[in-house]
Amino acid sequence: MPQICKQKISNTQNCDREEYKDGFCIIHHNGKDKPNNIFRKIIRDDIYRGFYNFSYMISYDGFSLEELKIEKDAEMIFRNSNFAGPFQIKNRDLTASFDFTDANFDSGLFITLSDIKKEIIIKNSNISMDLNFSLSNFDSLITYNTKINCKANFSNTCINGKFEFNHIYFKDNLNFLNAVFRDDFTFQNIIVEKDADFRNVVFFKKMKFENVEFKGNFKPAEIIDNDKIELKNVLINGKLIENNQKAKEDKKN
């Protein structure tokens, strides 16, 4: 019978994986004799048996959903997970949600050329090396209290549901070139240390920036003249916009 894992791997303390030499299960063992791509192999086995909760797991080799069959309406949970290698989803059509609460991505988070038809949540997390969500369709993207210590690319991506970024720190460039937002876009309590590119962005409902500081060059500069976009306490290209909706609000009153 397999031993109980000494680390909590998912929503249960009973780990069905055998205990390894150092007393930990194979996924947490970090010795030189650790098999290559063990994290991906275990992920593959778990998905085949309908297990989608990968919380508290440690990946030394990264993670990819390549060639894995995911059931419809699956909830992919990666809470408190750590990825030393890149996390990659490429060219996939998935009716699945992803929860990256309290996760760390040391070598990048990549979801490209994909259609994700349920919600993606990134909360209390850290992303380094690269963040690339380009050339994709997402149902909704909710990100809260997260440090993005790298370039962030959302170019040529369509968000069909809500897009909410709150309390986010961008250490490098931010790219939304040619992005499409079919529902509300909310960008609050944000610092962008370098350049931001919002050229050719299309939005269908509300687009709101509040308590945002763009320290680098912002494109297009003409955004400050568009009163259909809400700007409240926003620093853009060295100019502070306290409230570009004030005239409209005064008329209503």
Task: State the predicted function of each range.
Residues 1-253:
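N-terminal leader/targeting and pre-domain segments
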